[in-house]
């Protein structure tokens, strides 16, 4: 198994596949907070929050806080795609964010609370999108990729499960 990509690398779906799998993406986005909370509780009970998932990788604590940071960005990217004409989405330095004191000194419970509320709003928003809204586009300045809303949802559906895979590696 590739520990960096425990569920495999992201492959962006074509438009037809993304459209056909919207329900799956919504399910994954909606269920992620409970899954991460369950894993976090086990990691905490076994005193493993500060163990990296692989040599040179983030600790479980960093992964959990990263999910909150990244998915806040994701939610805002989805909202911008729904409300602006082909917005430009900007990257951020996630590796540097993972070293800041709000990651190293704050209990993971804070990020679990963020994920619960955020994913409820995000899944609710996406569940009400029309076909035309799912086809709205945004340009990601860091990757140079133009995303449709459904391919953006596919990306973050994968992203959550990707990091769940990292948390499971720590528990092994």
Task: Give the residues covered by each predicted segment.
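A structural signal for long alpha-helical coiled-coils and helix-turn connectors
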Residues: 40, 44, 82, 130, ...
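A short small-residue
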Residues: 9-16, 95-103, 142
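Solvent-exposed interaction patches of small proteins and small membrane subunits
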Residues: 17-27, 52, 84, 105-106, ...
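Acidic/histidine-rich alpha-helical segments that form the ligand environment
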Residues: 28-41, 98-136, 156
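Terminal targeting/low-complexity segments that flank the catalytic cores of oxidoreductases
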Residues: 1-31
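Short, contiguous alpha-helical
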Residues: 1-7, 49-95, 120-123, 135-172
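Short, contiguous, helix-prone interaction/anchoring segments in small proteins
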Residues: 19-54
């Amino acid at each position: 198994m590739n520990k960096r990509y425990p569920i495999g690398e992201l492959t962006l779906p074509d438009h037809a596949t993304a459209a056909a799998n919207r329900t799956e993406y919504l399910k994954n986005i909606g269920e992620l907070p409970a899954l991460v909370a369950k894993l976090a509780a086990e990691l905490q009970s076994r005193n493993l929050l500060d163990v990296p998932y692989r040599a040179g990788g983030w600790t479980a604590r960093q992964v959990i806080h990263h999910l909150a940071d990244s998915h806040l960005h994701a939610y805002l990217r989805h909202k911008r795609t729904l409300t602006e004409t082909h917005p430009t989405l900007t990257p951020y330095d996630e590796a540097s964010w993972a070293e800041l004191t709000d990651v190293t000194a704050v209990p993971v419970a804070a990020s679990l609370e963020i994920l619960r509320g955020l994913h409820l709003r995000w899944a609710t928003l996406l569940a009400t999108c029309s076909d035309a809204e799912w086809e709205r586009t945004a340009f990601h300045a860091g990757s140079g990729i133009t995303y449709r809303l459904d391919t953006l949802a596919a990306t973050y559906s994968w992203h959550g499960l990707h990091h769940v895979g990292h948390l499971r590696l720590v528990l092994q």
